[in-house]
């Protein structure tokens, strides 16, 4: 079949043969790009500041799909994952459950629900017990931004005077040198990560709507899309 195609192409006038050559190049390039984006890499733009300063608003990042196809997510990974659905009318994001017919936020019929992808850091692995507790340190205004001194963190009031909190994994305090600022204490929390699932949080801990506040706190393995490797716009920067 390929031989017949080449013979047919050689019989075409020069201009048509040249055009066909270019068409072949574009088709092959598109096929390679499609394969790369669906099998090997994941390309994502970060719309919020929940991962600052590791990843800034508007950054574009590249992740490796192969990392989670042939391996397991590791604690500390910055991951791209499928969170759920977004209303096609008001763009309200819903969790992992199938998109409802009516948006619970705007009350409009959802005709074309959009898949929502988030970027967060893996904190809890299957079987882990994650606890968030006060660590006994007072949050200083030169460390915690003044705008958060009287903040309501997603409906949970921060302690007054402000006290910082820490994450404990299976009873041991987690070292988190990637945090933008100390996490404010909003009350004790405890999560037991089920088998085949993961617990993820944002690095900008005081401004991140993450697993602490989702109705379903855990992301199933099949929802984990890729491990973020680097930012490619604006400028190239490794993401750790």
Regions found by a protein language model. Give the residues of each.
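Soluble "head" domains of membrane/secretory-pathway proteins
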Residues: 2-20, 35, 39, 44-45, ...
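A short acidic/basic microdomain associated with nuclease active sites
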Residues: 48
